[in-house]
């Protein structure tokens, strides 16, 4: 009864109701040939019949119908009875040889699995003279198994199909400067690759020449193409849409972002979700219990109430067929696989069914500031000439000095000013303060508040202006000559456009957002206000963030943590659910997290919670369906007139219902655009 867990990242993730692995490997790398599997229980992955599955099951159904018709229409003579029994035996052999082999192995190991139940039921029915029914039951059961596995394959193919998007060849630049098409697996890290419009990117890399729009829905789930230019990262399997790009390869085949997604999802699905573990423990007790109950139905009524033995045995065999917990066992893995796949198709990489189920319980989320709520890089947001200085001259001088500095704040100033670059003489960096130089023969400095104070150029009006900017979370750089301040340039890490809407979504789900940052408290409050967060905590070291997450767990209950840096890793690991921003995040943060948001969209946290809640609802719908149908037919079998036909249709119907219901989660989030 216990499904076989896959070993390692590359193995099967979950099992069907009879223990057959549902592999999430891409089609080219499948470990199992499903066309050669017996739907009736080839559970060791081998074909036990002379024909592939569909023709063999079709033949079994035809022969079983012939056996039924011979029983109903032909004379009840010994010759015709032997003919009918022979037809039934052929049908059982075609459909059920694999089931018998698996059932015998289970019995030899002391386990009462589903195949053992079906083997005993069919054999018993045949021996007590119900051979037409035994043949039809086995054929229908085999057909149900085949349909069930084909339906479950949809979840596997949805994620496995992503791997097929990566092209097999790449156009690589040779040492002589020519372009040559080579196998993608032969392209080394550091090589330059050309990607033409309409082609798929073969490997991860950084753009070195050109500009284009990239459809990266297959990796990040973004429905709108993203503009890429020199210095931007591109992912394998994404589609170059408009312009030719040259890129320097940063990851070889097998280690791209898409490879990591597939590997992580496979590893995640090899683990068991809480509901799935519960169902497996329940089934391990349920099956032998039902076997004992069926034995009691076969023996006790004839002894205690005088029932005919054949009638009691028949009811017991019907009970065994009804008892097969196919629907119950398969209800959880198919649902969890579908939920994980739906998330992965939107750029949400959930590392296991446990986290998929647990996300629904979140009551609070701690959010890092830089790179999570904000863009993660400084931008010039405001500037003004000071003390009557000329606007144009002030702007040009500041840009000229900023261009020659590698400091991020200087780069933001240079990028934010329309400028005519003027020559700078005697340029020098002032460590911890700013830079100085001569612009058009005039000695100038571009530096922080401390530098201006040291030069004695501060005034009450200037201090008031600086305070006003600092209260908004801005860093102010000042341009000054030897006598006066000439201009103020305010730089800030701006809030991402979607952050406020994402926070509102979390609140609507009943989740309290709290911002945790190492920046000063003033900046923290300004950013939190812009994002719509009431609780902002600044000046925190990594250990402080860890303590804050623990405090939030005590106060609110289940708490998530969202971050992208090394300093967030301890809190990510400690939280009930850790969310890492994958596009900008560090490898350490991504390893520590339970969920990776591949496109850094904060709104995907709310999507994860909604998907978790829907997955939980579908899981319990499936469990209720499976158990409810069993209970009804148990009553009919013991006290009513349920037949084996009714039993097998009930079992088959319940299995197909829970599979179809679980697969609905693939539509819970719109599928990504797959380029043709």
Predicted segments — roles?
Residues 1-83, 152, 161, 176-184, ...:
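Flexible metal-binding regulatory segments at protein termini and peripheral loops
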Residues 441, 475, 481-621, 629, ...:
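Conserved ATP-binding TGD loop and adjacent catalytic N/P-domain core of P-type ATPases
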Residues 89-92, 142, 285-286, 313-331, ...:
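Small-residue-enriched core segments of transmembrane alpha-helices in multipass membrane transport
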Residues 24-29, 64-68, 88-173, 179, ...:
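Actuator/coupling domain of P-type ATPases
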Residues 117-119, 154-159, 168, 219, ...:
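Conserved catalytic phosphorylation-site environment of P-type ATPases
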Residues 69-80, 100-103, 108, 120, ...:
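Membrane-embedded alpha-helical bundles of multi-pass transporters
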Residues 380-511, 521, 530-549:
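P-type ATPase nucleotide-binding
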Residues 59-62, 277-306, 318-325, 332-333, ...:
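Bilayer-spanning, highly hydrophobic alpha-helical transmembrane segments
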């Amino acid at each position: 009864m216990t499904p076989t867990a896959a070993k390692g990242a590359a193995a099967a993730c979950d099992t069907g109701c009879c223990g057959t692995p549902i592999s999430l490997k891409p089609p080219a790398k499948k470990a199992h040939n499903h066309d050669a599997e017996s739907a009736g229980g080839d559970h060791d992955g081998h074909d036990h019949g002379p024909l592939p599955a569909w023709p063999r099951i079709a033949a079994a159904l035809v022969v079983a119908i012939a056996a039924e018709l011979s029983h109903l229409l032909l004379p009840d003579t010994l010759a015709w009875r032997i003919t009918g029994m022979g037809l039934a035996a052929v049908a059982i052999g075609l459909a059920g040889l694999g089931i018998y082999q698996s059932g015998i192995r289970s019995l030899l190991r002391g386990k009462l699995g589903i195949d053992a139940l079906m083997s005993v039921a069919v054999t018993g029915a045949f021996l007590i003279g119900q051979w037409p029914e035994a043949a039809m039951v086995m054929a229908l059961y085999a057909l149900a198994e085949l349909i069930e596995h084909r339906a479950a394959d949809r979840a596997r193919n949805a994620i496995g199909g992503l791997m097929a998007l990566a092209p097999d060849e790449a156009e690589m630049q040779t040492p002589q400067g020519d372009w040559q098409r080579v196998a993608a697996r032969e392209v080394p890290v550091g090589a330059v690759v050309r990607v033409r419009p309409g082609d798929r990117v073969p490997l991860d890399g950084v753009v070195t020449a050109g500009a284009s729009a990239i459809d990266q829905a297959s990796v990040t789930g973004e429905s709108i193409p993203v503009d890429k230019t020199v210095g931007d990262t591109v992912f394998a399997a994404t589609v170059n849409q408009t312009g030719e790009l040259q890129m320097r390869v940063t990851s070889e085949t097998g280690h791209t972002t898409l490879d990591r997604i597939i590997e992580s999802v496979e590893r995640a699905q090899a683990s068991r979700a809480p509901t799935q573990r519960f169902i497996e423990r329940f089934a391990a007790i349920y099956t032998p219990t039902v076997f004992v109950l069926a034995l009691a139905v076969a023996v006790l009524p004839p002894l205690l109430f005088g029932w005919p033995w054949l009638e009691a045995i028949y009811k017991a065999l019907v009970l065994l067929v009804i008892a097969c917990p196919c629907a119950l066992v398969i209800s959880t893995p198919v649902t969890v696989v579908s939920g994980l796949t739906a998330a992965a198709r939107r750029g949400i990489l959930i590392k296991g069914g446990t986290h998929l189920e647990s996300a629904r319980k979140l009551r609070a989320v701690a959010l890092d500031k830089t790179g999570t709520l904000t863009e993660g890089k400084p931008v010039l947001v405001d500037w003004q000439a000071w003390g009557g200085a000329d606007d144009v001259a002030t702007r040009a001088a500041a840009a000229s000095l900023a261009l020659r500095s590698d400091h991020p704040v200087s780069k933001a100033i240079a990028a934010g000013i329309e400028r005519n670059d003027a020559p700078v003489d005697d340029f020098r960096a002032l460590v911890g303060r700013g830079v100085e130089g001569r612009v058009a023969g005039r000695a100038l400095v571009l530096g922080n508040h401390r530098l201006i104070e040291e030069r004695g150029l501060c005034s009450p009006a200037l201090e008031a202006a600086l305070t006003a900017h600092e209260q908004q979370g801005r860093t102010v750089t000042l341009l000054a000559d030897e006598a006066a301040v000439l201009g103020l340039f305010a730089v800030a890490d701006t809030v991402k456009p979607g952050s406020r809407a994402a926070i509102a979504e979390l609140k609507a789900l009943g989740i309290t957002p709290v911002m945790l940052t190492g920046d000063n408290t003033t900046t923290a409050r300004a950013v939190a206000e812009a994002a719509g967060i009431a609780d902002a905590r600044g000046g925190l070291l990594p250990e402080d963030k860890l303590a804050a997450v623990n405090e939030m767990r005590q106060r609110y209950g289940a708490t998530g943590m969202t971050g992208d840096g090394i300093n967030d890793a301890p809190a990510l690991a400690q939280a009930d659910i850790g969310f890492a921003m994958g596009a900008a995040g560090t490898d350490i943060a991504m390893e520590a997290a339970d969920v990776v948001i591949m496109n850094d969209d904060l709104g995907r946290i709310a999507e994860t919670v909604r998907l978790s809640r829907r997955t939980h609802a579908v899981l319990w719908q499936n469990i209720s369906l499976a158990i409810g149908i069993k209970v009804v037919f148990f009553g009919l079998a013991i006290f009513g007139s349920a037949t084996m036909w009714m039993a097998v249709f009930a079992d088959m119907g319940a299995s197909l219902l829970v599979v179809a219901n679980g697969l609905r989660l693939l539509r819970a989030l719109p599928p990504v655009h797959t380029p043709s």
